[in-house]
Curated annotation (Swiss-Prot):
Its main location: secreted. It comes from the Eukaryota. Gene3D superfamilies: Knottin, scorpion toxin-like. This is Potassium channel toxin alpha-KTx 6.5.
Amino acid sequence: DEAIRCTGTKDCYIPCRYITGCFNSRCINKSCKCYGCT
């Protein structure tokens, strides 16, 4: 599983939406954490 690099949470919205179908995500330690749909 490739880490998605980020400088801020907004960098994660599009890639996480692509992966999980939802924007719910955060940028932690310069990589994205995708939470999927809640």
